From Swiss-Prot:
It is an enzyme of class 3 (hydrolase). Na(+) binds at residues 162, 165, 168. Belongs to the peptidase T1B family. HslV subfamily. This is ATP-dependent protease subunit HslV. Allosterically activated by HslU binding. It is found in: Cytoplasm. InterPro entries: ATP-dep_Prtase_HsIV_su, Ntn_hydrolases_N, Proteasome_sua/b, Proteasome_suB-type.
Amino acid sequence: MEQYHGTTIVSVRRGNQVALGGDGQVTLGNIVMKGSARKVRAIYDGKVLVGFAGATADAFSLLDRFEAKLQKHQGNLLRSAVDLAKDWRTDRALRHLEAMLIVADREATLVITGNGDVLDPEGGIAAIGSGGSYAQSAAKALMENTDLAPRDVVEKSLRIAGELCIYTNTNFVIETLE
């Protein structure tokens, strides 16, 4: 059975601000199934931002598990991410989930993968999904050459990715923490 896939999620951190945004396109093969999906959310009483890319059902399953880990570890982002990655890597059922997450709070941004990786991205920029490379490149250039706020960098980066990646549209959801 073919999976739903394709998206762009990007996070930018500057000073005491962090923004996380994503597009709204859900694709099944070469068909756009939905253009307004919400793949970025504020969770844990608005203290943590999370964005996901990959197979939609898998991503929602991981999002639920990550929220449970945050509750268990009283909002400690790193411990929650490592605990989720460990389960994801070792659990037989979870091991087959095809998705990635970017999570962020006031102090850190992390990328969580199904390989058991918890990555702290360099330069305060993280991006995943089919248009992630485009968005990350655009965000890096904007961060190095402008004084734009993280939200504006995320929006412009997503717009560029949406113009280049066929699996990314320009219907964005952007969340911020200050």
